[in-house]
Amino acid sequence: LENMSAYCASKAAVNIFGEILAKEVKDTNIRVMVVCPAQTDTPLMRFVDETDAPDAINTAVKKGMLCDPEEVVDQIEKDLLTDKIICYPSKEAVYATRIRRFFPNYWWKLVAKNS
């Protein structure tokens, strides 16, 4: 899990910024929702070999573990019709978030195993 600290720190910062911003503007006509998808099958995956963890992503691609982008968009659209601040557009995103939050040691073992 090399060279991921900047990515992880910036992702965490953007997530909490979005959550707080949503609370700050709740009484206005502005709507903020943080979207937390799992790895999604997008053109970005074509650049997988240029990342620091190509093996983990290639494994996910080969095993069909990437989320369908249309399903992700469908869930985002549904959640926009609610008061949700955070959108987890796939069951994989929900599972990953819960495992990381409640079982951090197990989460990091999974990450290391798949890296």
Regions found by a protein language model. Name each.
Residues 84-115:
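A transmembrane-helix-recognition feature enriched in membrane-embedded lipid enzymes
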Residues 23, 27-91:
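SDR active-site lid
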Residues 10:
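Active-site helix of classical SDR
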Residues 1-5:
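Active-site loop immediately N-terminal to the catalytic Tyr-X3-Lys motif
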Residues 13, 20-21, 25:
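Conserved alpha-helical elements of the SDR catalytic core
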Residues 7, 15:
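Catalytic tyrosine of NAD(P)H-dependent dehydrogenase/reductases that use a Tyr as the general acid/base
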